[in-house]
Amino acid sequence: KVIIRKSKLSAMSTPAANNMTNTPINKEPRIAPDTQAPRDQAWQQDLAKAITGAEQGLLDLQHADGYWCFELEADCTIPAEYIMMMHFMDDIDTGLQSKLAKYIRSKQQSEGGWPLYLYGKFDMSCSVKAYYALKLAGDDPEAAHMRKARELILQHGGAARSNVFKRLALAMFQQIPWRGVPYLPAEIMLLPRWFPFHLTKVSYWTRTVVVPLTILYSLKAKAANPQQVNVRELFTLDPDKERNYFPVRSRLNWLFLMIERAARHLEWAVPRRIRDKAIKRAHDWFVERLNGDDGLGAIFPAMVNAHEALALLGYDKDHELSKTTKRALEKLLVDRGDMAYCQPCVSPVWDTALASAALLETGDERTRTHLKSACDWLVERQLTDEAGDWRDIKPDVPGGGWAFQFANPYYPDLDDTGVVGWVMHDLDSDAYKDSINKAARWISGLQSKDGGFAAFDADNTHYVLN
């Protein structure tokens, strides 16, 4: 995410950063002409003009509270999922749906598909979701753009070749049988820590996405789908006759598939009281982490699963939890007037840290007030005593990290924390000494046994689960 200057790494290397001294902002520009390069005066003037323009551009975009937060645009999977969520819930905002659909159409490539990134290659899962969302929004399947998309999807093997998350959505919309998706029973919530699979052994985003998903799987969720829109035309073989939803890629993969198949065949034997206990534990786990209007894990996939799981568990749309999950999803929307899209999350802490680091590099004393405002805003968002999943492995380490988003207390990360600490140290290490020391202690405390550092948890090296 960022190029690390070695001088800053050495400054932050002590666990408590006790010997940091005041390092006022450098008044001399850090970008100087290379004496070995041609002395092109026009080039130097253009460079200086670009730096000045970028500096002013950042200052103009700083929020009054001190932070920066830019749009976080992703691929069309997320706006497509937003449309599908509205049809799953039978809670359709037709105006918003029209704007989302227009955005999705605007991103379709000339050959008919949708990529995962700008100018990327065709992606099956993204294209299937985009096609389904457009059909739900009312696009005629015989329209030119829909025909092109459908033909390309079929050329690549059809919707059965989608990834597991897309197939889960297809199962919930009753387009494929549930045997076409991974076995995700809520009983995984009851597994002991020593078991090969445990929530602490997967990434935070996997936890927050999968836990509500186990409820959707266990109760075999069915989308309301009020217009009963289907996409059977995207399959090369009747989905009920398809036998190759899980192609074997390796011996280890084959072993996992055999274990999963055996467990699936024994699902009927799970006592109802065990299933109910597991669903309740999954419910309690994600409700505890709902995170208010900032949402579960502060990421869209987890938030939408939580919203749908609450509905499946019988929560009325006017229940406070349901209203909270809906508001969290709505906060991710970006409305551009005639079209709209949904962000995967927001990034104010990261944007503020990087913008501040860039402004520090200019050496311009005029930015000090802006940088102090940014660092003061960051101080208020440092996570110290809050509960967090990272404490499962390191319960005795004092808090001191920052999360990526406005609020995500369960999931601070080491890369945001490191960059924020460097920025504070560069600006005024005396003024921000307390925050810097807390950050350094937290980073040091989350070092893994093998010597490395991960983003969210120590010792999360269970690579076989990949």
For each feature predicted by the language model, list its residue ranges:
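Short, low-complexity, intrinsically disordered N-terminal modules
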Residues: 1-3
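Preference for long, amphipathic alpha-helical scaffolds in soluble/luminal domains
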Residues: 5-8, 12-466
